[in-house]
Amino acid sequence: RGSXLTILPLRNIID
């Protein structure tokens, strides 16, 4: 979440 990874599918596990 705002980690920057929000553009990656990983956002589903870090949301």
UniProtKB/Swiss-Prot annotation:
A biological process (GO) of this protein is: proteolysis
The Enzyme Commission number assigned here is 3.4.23.-
Per UniProt, subcellular location reads as: Secreted
Family recorded in the similarity comment: Belongs to the peptidase A1 family.
Q: Which organism is it from?
A: Bubalus bubalis (Domestic water buffalo)
Q: Does the keyword Flavoprotein apply?
A: no
How does it get modified after it is made? N-glycosylated.
- From the Swiss-Prot or TrEMBL record, give the protein name: Pregnancy-associated glycoprotein 70
Please list the tissues where expression of this protein has been recorded: Expressed in chorionic epithelium (trophectoderm).
Sorted keywords for this record are: Aspartyl protease, Glycoprotein, Hydrolase, Protease, Secreted
List the GO cellular component terms. extracellular region
Q: What top-level class of enzyme does the UniProt entry assign?
A: hydrolase
One GO term in the molecular function aspect is:
aspartic-type endopeptidase activity
